[in-house]
């Protein structure tokens, strides 16, 4: 039988062939309709296919026939006849009809089987649902049973717990009663005769039961003391009943506890000598019952070698201060303290290991140890290096002065703060080691601001004495100096020094560093910084003001020398050497004062820069502190500004006096009224002009260097105005002809070219007007009225110059001008 169809017997190609028999199994699994169809028709078509293959090459096969290889028909088909083209069509139709009939039958069979299966499934489903319902009812009943059982178990458990509690309470009461009986028995033993400890139980004398004895003794003493306290309260209330108390027991217990404590301490010391940490720990644990073990802790700390060995203290002093009799320096002390405090930290660290292994409360022991270290060992060395000096009679600067004490204080404070941090890292329990460290320096810090200000004052006085000594030494080595050459010697020897001001700032900066170190609160820091900075302002103000005053004294001496020269000239009419000496003194004093002004400006700039970089940031956190310091700085420097202003006025007077002297001595009457002798006119400036410009160029060189900004502009403007007035006054002493007018124009060009270097527009304008006015000496008389038509404001000055014309009277210029300028007549 082939795949898909089972044949019952042979069949032919006729229409009346036997029907196909299809099996339902053919439709199970991977069913293929193509395969079924091929199996049905393969027995009818092979002859047709062979004939087609023989009759026509290239026509190909009928599509789908080659693939029909599955299935066969019952019987063998007859050879194909050549009459009809497709003779098996009837057989195929009959075949298909039979197949359809069998397929219908098969479907009915399948439908029947499906109905039967549905009924069976429905029946089984009903049975299954009924079974599940019964199971659920059984589970619910089971849960209820478990709940009842759990409730009974809980009830039984609670009852058992209550019974256990009662049993435990009863056992505790029994134990307490037993202990109370024992305690009462022991208490009665202690309440015997005063001081009689011989009849005590063996417990209190057995060394192996010391811990138990100590615990019982402490309980008995607490009870006895409480009983005495209650009796005292009742007596105070008037309810006391006469009877014997427990005073004897308390006294005997105290004696026994003291004796036991001393015995344990002795055992503890012996174990400590042997480094027997186990025995030490046992003793410490028992001793902790006596006053919480305070005596044992203190005893252990007090017996440390660093607290009882005198050689340790001597070694500390040698390490920090060096050999006896030598003057210690802050740097050496800093190194010594660092080494000493490192040794102390290492020792405390080693002790911490022992304390942790021995004591039940190591933190409390460490607190006592660290406190003892700071209060005894550290305080001992601080007392040696910090001897507080007296402000009434401070040590001299040659021996270090107050500054040495302050530097030592700062070094000691820094190193001790570092020690406190190291000890905190090692461990010091609940001890506030930082606060304790601060307390070691409290007496020094309370008076620190006064010592700092006194030190700055002492340094300033020492510096001034040093400068005065140097000046006196130079003066003595120079010998006798003539008045003409020595007018400014004393001033130059004590000239303002920027280096000295830098020293002031350096001292103050060091003081501010210490102030920052000692002042933890912003308000305190701001107040101390302000006070210390005020010291600097006072020092700089006094120093530069005195320096400017000395430079002014030199200017005054030069002015006095000029006055003597003038008086001498009036009397003797000849003092050329004296005049030159006075001029040299004036020029020297001018330059000296300009140097003083320049150094004064540099000094002020240094102070202002120092304030901006170091002081202001410390004052800003406190309201008003920064503004107050700025105001103080302005007030302090105003004195120096006033001295500088007066000195600059004197400088102008000195320069004008010398210019006046040069003009008076060098200007000749013929300079502006040359005779008409046929010689060509001299177009060079006059000798007086040349001398004046050369003098001004030389002397003002120092002013250009020393002054700057608005100060320079104001000084040169004032000098230019004074020079213009002086020249006007000077020229009104002469008579001018046209050649002299040209000479005057040449002088004016020199003066104008020089004053342009002043950079003062108002001065330039005045000298330009002088050049216009000088034209009155050059133009013809008839051109004078039209000369100032565009400049009516200078007609008054021009009229005074016109009167200096040589032909003023001969040309009757007064009459002409009065008619043209009636307002000026």
Swiss-Prot record:
Name of a matching Pfam family: Sec10_N
Gene Ontology biological process terms in this record: exocytosis
Record's subcellular location: Cytoplasm, Cytosol; Secreted, Extracellular exosome
Coiled coil, from the record: 244-266
GO cellular component, one term: extracellular exosome
Keyword Protein transport tagged: no
Tissue expression remark: Expressed in seedlings, roots, leaves and flowers.
Keywords attached to this entry: Coiled coil, Cytoplasm, Exocytosis, Secreted, Transport
Reported phenotype of the disruption mutant: No visible phenotype, due to the redundancy with SEC10b.
Predominant subcellular localization, coarse grouping: cytoplasm
Subunit and partners: The exocyst complex is composed of SEC3, SEC5, SEC6, SEC8, SEC10, EXO70A1 and EXO84B. Interacts with EXO84B. Binds to EXO70E2. Binds directly to B1L.
Family statement: Belongs to the SEC10 family.
Function summary: Component of the exocyst complex involved in the docking of exocytic vesicles with fusion sites on the plasma membrane during regulated or polarized secretion. Involved in polarized cell growth and organ morphogenesis. During cytokinesis, involved in cell plate initiation, cell plate maturation and formation of new primary cell wall.
Identification of the protein by name: Exocyst complex component SEC10a
Organism listed in the record: Arabidopsis thaliana (Mouse-ear cress)
Lineage: Eukaryota, Viridiplantae, Streptophyta, Embryophyta, Tracheophyta
């Amino acid at each position: 039988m082939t795949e898909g169809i089972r044949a019952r017997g042979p069949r032919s190609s006729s229409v009346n062939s036997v029907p196909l028999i299809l099996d339902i199994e053919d439709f199970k699994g991977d069913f293929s309709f193509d395969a079924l169809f091929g199996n049905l028709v393969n027995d009818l078509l092979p002859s047709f296919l062979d004939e087609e293959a023989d009759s026509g090459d290239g026509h190909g096969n009928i599509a789908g026939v080659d693939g029909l290889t599955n299935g066969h028909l019952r019987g063998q088909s007859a050879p194909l006849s050549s009459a009809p083209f497709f003779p098996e069509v009837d057989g195929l139709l009959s075949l298909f009809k039979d197949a359809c009939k069998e397929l219908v039958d098969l479907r009915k069979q399948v439908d029947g089987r499906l109905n039967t299966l549905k009924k069976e499934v429905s029946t089984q489903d009903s049975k299954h649902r009924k079974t599940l319902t019964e199971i659920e009812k059984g589970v619910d009943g089971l849960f209820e049973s478990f709940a009842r059982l759990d409730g009974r178990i809980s009830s039984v458990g609670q009852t058992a717990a209550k019974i256990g509690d009662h049993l435990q309470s009863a056992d505790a009461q029994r134990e307490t009663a037993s202990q109370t009986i024992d305690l009462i028995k022991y208490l009665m033993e202690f309440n015997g005769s005063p001081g009689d400890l011989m009849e005590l139980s063996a417990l209190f004398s057995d060394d192996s039961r010391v811990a138990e004895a100590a615990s019982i003794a402490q309980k008995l003493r607490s009870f006895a003391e409480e009983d005495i306290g209650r009796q005292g309260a009742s007596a105070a209330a008037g309810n006391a009943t006469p009877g014997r108390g427990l005073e004897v027991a308390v006294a005997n217990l105290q004696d026994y506890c003291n004796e036991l404590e001393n015995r344990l301490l002795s055992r503890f010391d012996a174990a400590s000598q042997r480094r027997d940490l186990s025995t030490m720990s046992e003793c410490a644990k028992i001793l902790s019952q006596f006053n919480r073990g305070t005596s044992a802790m203190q005893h252990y700390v007090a017996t440390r070698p660093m607290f009882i060995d005198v050689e340790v203290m001597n070694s500390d002093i040698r390490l920090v201060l060096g050999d006896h009799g030598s003057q210690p320096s802050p740097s050496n002390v800093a190194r010594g303290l660092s080494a000493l405090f490192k040794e102390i930290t290492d020792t405390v660290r080693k002790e911490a290991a022992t304390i942790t292994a021995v004591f039940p409360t190591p933190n409390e022991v460490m607190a006592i140890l660290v406190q003892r270290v700071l209060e005894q060992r550290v305080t001992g060395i601080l007392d040696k290096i910090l001897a507080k000096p007296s402000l009434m009679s401070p040590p001299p600067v040659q021996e270090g002065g107050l500054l040495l004490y302050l530097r030592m204080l700062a070094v000691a404070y820094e190193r001790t703060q570092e020690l406190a941090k190291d000890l905190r890292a090692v461990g010091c329990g609940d001890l506030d080691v930082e606060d304790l460290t601060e307390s070691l320096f409290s007496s020094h810090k309370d008076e620190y601001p006064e010592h700092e200000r006194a030190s700055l004052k002492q340094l300033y006085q020492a510096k001034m004495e040093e400068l005065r000594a140097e000046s006196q030494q130079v003066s003595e080595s120079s010998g006798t100096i003539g008045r003409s050459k020595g007018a400014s010697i004393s001033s130059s020897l004590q000239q303002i020094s920027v280096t000295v001001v830098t020293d002031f700032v350096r001292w103050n900066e060091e003081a501010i560093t210490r102030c920052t170190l000692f002042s933890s609160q912003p308000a305190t820091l701001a107040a101390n910084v302000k006070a210390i900075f005020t010291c600097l302002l006072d020092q700089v103000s006094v120093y530069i003001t005195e320096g400017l005053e000395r430079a002014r004294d030199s200017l005054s001496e030069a002015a006095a020398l000029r006055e003597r020269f003038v008086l001498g000239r009036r009397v003797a009419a000849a003092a050329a050497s004296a005049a030159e000496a006075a001029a040299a003194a004036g020029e020297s004093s001018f330059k000296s004062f300009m140097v003083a002004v320049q150094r004064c400006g540099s000094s002020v700039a240094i102070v202002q820069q120092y304030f901006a970089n170091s002081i202001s940031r410390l004052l800003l956190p406190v309201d008003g502190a920064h503004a107050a310091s700025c105001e103080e700085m302005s007030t302090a420097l105003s004195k120096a500004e006033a001295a500088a202003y007066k000195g600059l006025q004197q400088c102008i007077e000195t320069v004008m006096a010398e210019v006046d002297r040069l003009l008076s001595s060098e200007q000749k009457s013929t300079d502006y009224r040359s005779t008409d002798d046929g010689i060509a006119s001299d177009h060079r400036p006059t000798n007086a002009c040349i001398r004046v410009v050369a003098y001004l160029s030389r002397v003002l060189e120092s002013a250009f260097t020393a002054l700057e900004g608005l100060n320079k502009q104001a000084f040169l403007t004032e000098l230019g105005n004074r020079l213009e007035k002086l020249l006007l006054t000077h020229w009104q002493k002469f008579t001018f002809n046209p050649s002299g007018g040209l000479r005057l124009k040449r002088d004016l060009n020199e003066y104008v070219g020089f004053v342009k270097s002043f950079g003062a527009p108002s001065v330039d304008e005045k000298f330009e007007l002088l050049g216009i006015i000088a034209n009155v000496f050059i133009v013809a008389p008839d051109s004078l009225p039209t000369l100032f038509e565009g400049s009516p404001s200078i007609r008054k000055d021009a009229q005074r110059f016109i009167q200096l014309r040589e032909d003023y009277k001969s040309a009757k210029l007064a009459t002409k001008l009065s008619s043209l300028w009636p307002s000026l007549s």
